[in-house]
Amino acid sequence: MFGLFIITAIAEILGCYFPYLILKEGKSAWLWLPTALSLAVFVWLLTLHPAASGRIYAAYGGIYIFTALMWLRFVDQVALTRWDILGGVIVLCGAGLIILQPQGLIR
């Protein structure tokens, strides 16, 4: 399930990054096409998660933050601060609790 969260986050980040390139960096308007595709894939991927939507969105939020921090480090090439790392660890712990809770507690 963790891999599905990561792929979902990458699709969403790409869907936001392409408009950033168009509007902020002056890149080609043709990037609206992969923007639409990325966001459509993102929405489709959300439907593949096997739990109630609210629980998925809550857990996904933590994985999204982790993925965004990896994007910051490796795509934007900005060094993470100790606050970035600590915040990432905290939200991953929270997402992990939601994702890995005992199945008997889930309705």
From Swiss-Prot:
Membrane topology note: Multi-pass membrane protein
A GO CC term assigned to this protein in UniProt: plasma membrane
Keyword Cell membrane among record annotations: yes
Regions that span the bilayer: 2-22, 28-48, 56-76, 85-105
Entry keywords, A to Z: Cell inner membrane, Cell membrane, Membrane, Transmembrane, Transmembrane helix
Classification via InterPro entries: UPF0060 (IPR003844)
Major location (coarse): membrane
Keyword Mitochondrion: no
Record's subcellular location: Cell inner membrane
Classification via HAMAP family: UPF0060
Recorded family membership: Belongs to the UPF0060 family.
Designated name of the protein: UPF0060 membrane protein A1S_1909
Organism: Acinetobacter baumannii (strain ATCC 17978 / DSM 105126 / CIP 53.77 / LMG 1025 / NCDC KC755 / 5377)
